[in-house]
Amino acid sequence: MKQKPIDDELKYLDERSRDIFRHIVEAYLNDGEPVGSRNLSRLLRQTLSPATIRNVMSDLEHLGLIYAPHVSAGRMPTQSGLRFFVDAFMEAGDLPNEERESIEAQVKEAGHAQSVEHFLVQASQILSDLSRGAGLVLASKYEGTLKHIEFVRLDGQQALAVLVTQQGEVENRIVHLPKGVTHAQLTEATNFLNAHIQGRTLSEAKEEIARLCSETRAALDHLSHHLVETGLALWGGEDADHKIHLIVRGRSNLLEDVKAEEDLERLRHLFDDLETRESMAQLLDLTDEGPGVRIFIGSENKLFSLSGSSLVVAPYRDSQQRVIGALGVIGPTRLNYARIVPMVNYTAQLVSQLLR
């Protein structure tokens, strides 16, 4: 997509051309249909003949901002046209107080969930309900801070390692015990870990325990030391610190805009692509490239190249302002961007606050 030449020429669009273009896009965002010169003449503040409007539309089409979906039809914005509209015309102000209060109440209610994952599922559903699109959350597997770990002796040479986060999530792993480990040594290892992991993320706790183990080898007996080193490492397989999972709610909302079988196929491609680990990691990285909300229209991002969809997404952060996930709305390219952008931004801020 060669955007640069278009950008250069757009700087010289006169007020009349901008006004006609803006009305074409707004009509498309409202009903998804092309608009013709006769209808435009009734919408414009200026009194212009249909012939004059057609001449301007021809110039806009030459610039790649609008196109005719079929012969003798009106005009609709291209992907480049939508991008220009979002960048040059859209005013994404604050949400109305009533909507802010509604979102805040729903997110806080969801915050009472028993686990972080359930809370994020609820956040995804809230975005879907508010936008009438699909709500999306990308979540790092271990974004929570740790509360404690415990070793529970099982039969034979095995114990159950139980890791609990301050957000209420519980993870269990089986650990194989060295021969001769006593109950007292299990307790010693548990106490040592709990003295140093509380309030830290998993990756921070691992670094701290590794540092302490190298310094305190003489302070712990051999078997207790082995348990300490093994404890948090149980959660290190398959890059667990960076494992990302996808939560989507409201996929059926996207079907309301499907007008042909090929549209359905594009949506299938979208969700197939999103659910690959590489794509999710890429999308999470993109949200960290700049502050605030990111807008991806159509094929601007390769994840959406086949889908004809747009994504409005914002990161949510931990207490150290590190990006630990992202949430947003997927919908057709004719999303109500002016409403969706502040909605996603405010929801991301609330989620960040509740996860700290």
Curated annotation (Swiss-Prot):
Keyword Transcription: yes
BP terms from Gene Ontology: negative regulation of DNA-templated transcription
Gene3D superfamilies (UniProt xref): 3.30.450.40, Heat-inducible transcription repressor hrca homolog, domain 3, Winged helix-like DNA-binding domain superfamily/Winged helix DNA-binding domain
Keyword Repressor: yes
GO molecular function: DNA binding
Coiled coil: none
Keywords carried by this UniProt record: Repressor, Stress response, Transcription, Transcription regulation
Function: Negative regulator of class I heat shock genes (grpE-dnaK-dnaJ and groELS operons). Prevents heat-shock induction of these operons.
PANTHER family: HEAT-INDUCIBLE TRANSCRIPTION REPRESSOR HRCA
UniProt record similarity statement: Belongs to the HrcA family.
Protein name, per record: Heat-inducible transcription repressor HrcA
Species assigned in the record: Bartonella quintana (strain Toulouse) (Rochalimaea quintana)
Name of the gene: hrcA
